[in-house]
Amino acid sequence: MSTTASTPSSLRHLISIKDLSDEEFRILVQRAQHFKNVFKANKTNDFQSNHLKLLGRTIALIFTKRSTRTRISTEGAATFFGAQPMFLGKEDIQLGVNESFYDTTKVVSSMVSCIFARVNKHEDILAFCKDSSVPIINSLCDKFHPLQAICDLLTIIENFNISLDEVNKGINSKLKMAWIGDANNVINDMCIACLKFGISVSISTPPGIEMDSDIVDEAKKVAERNGATFELTHDSLKASTNANILVTDTFVSMGEEFAKQAKLKQFKGFQINQELVSVADPNYKFMHCLPRHQEEVSDDVFYGEHSIVFEEAENRLYAAMSAIDIFVNNKGNFKDLK
């Protein structure tokens, strides 16, 4: 299955992290950090003179899946740049009921400056990209979740004091990220994102649940050129050993509720708890993109001193700002950012 879309050469979309060069992804994270600093410092003059670049324009949010963090962060980021966010839920528009993707995309993209699309299938993202006249930002599909990856790497570099200058020079951080759980859209982007920063990745999934082959192939290439390691296992203790970052996600994704009991049985023993963190680095950090359920991580880990989940959630705002700035304000050009 193709993960890329055929679009006009002058138009760039954010579909997945694997579509970006290492340098481009690092710039996205660096830009997110920049906007966080501006936002936190409340630099009013800087904000008014440099950031209201979309005043009088509209950013559409076409969401066919429910959302908390993605909707709030996207609307907040649009407002930061002076744009009017327009939320279009599945009950608000004709998409998929009385109107095709082609017709919807042609109409909506003619009236807005960008479309954030949160959809069920990756093919739906590609359909938007194929016919849109404005940038499409993938806000989640069943294959990828790039905004979460930008946010996660921002959270990691802040907590481990990673220098982007050193990363760009090939100086490896020697960090290890361990993922315990499902082979899903979040880890598809996060593993590539970590490897682009030279962070080694170990992924533990239950037997019978495997990473997509195209993601594995790409991960191996990115790991090799950045001096990192990439490991797949079904042994969570092995994956967690000496890990600096422990990460999990929901075991039952949206749309899989019908199979909840079967999936929970399959994931028995994959909870991140004291047994797993006991073999991790003593200064480990725990991450989760939320919402969280008890079977995924114990309360003492989730709410413990090593957890950075709420900082991670806040960083979704700055990830959205970075995406808008580069793909809308700067028309997909990663150079000459102001």
Swiss-Prot record:
InterPro entries: Asp/Orn_carbamoyltranf_P-bd, Asp/Orn_carbamoylTrfase, Asp/Orn_carbamoylTrfase_sf, Asp_carbamoyltransf_Asp/Orn-bd, Orn/put_carbamltrans. GO terms for cellular component: cytosol; mitochondrion; ornithine carbamoyltransferase inhibitor complex. The keyword Nucleus does not apply. Changing T68G: Reduces activity by 95%. Reduces affinity for ornithine 2-fold. Its EC number is 2.1.3.3. Changing N184Q: Reduces activity by 50%. Reduces affinity for ornithine 20-fold. Changing N185Q: No effect on activity. Reduces affinity for ornithine 200-fold. It is found in: Cytoplasm. Forms a stable complex with CAR1 in the presence of ornithine and arginine. In this complex CAR1 retains activity, but ARG3 activity is inhibited. Changing D182N: Reduces activity by 33%. Reduces affinity for ornithine 30-fold. SUPFAM superfamilies: Aspartate/ornithine carbamoyltransferase (SSF53671). It catalyses: carbamoyl phosphate + L-ornithine = L-citrulline + phosphate + H(+). Pathway: Amino-acid biosynthesis; L-arginine biosynthesis; L-arginine from L-ornithine and carbamoyl phosphate: step 1/3. GO terms for biological process: arginine biosynthetic process via ornithine; citrulline biosynthetic process; L-arginine biosynthetic process. NCBIfam families: orni_carb_tr, PRK00779.1. Present with 1140 molecules/cell in log phase SD medium. Belongs to the aspartate/ornithine carbamoyltransferase superfamily. OTCase family. This is Ornithine carbamoyltransferase. It comes from Saccharomyces cerevisiae (strain ATCC 204508 / S288c) (Baker's yeast).
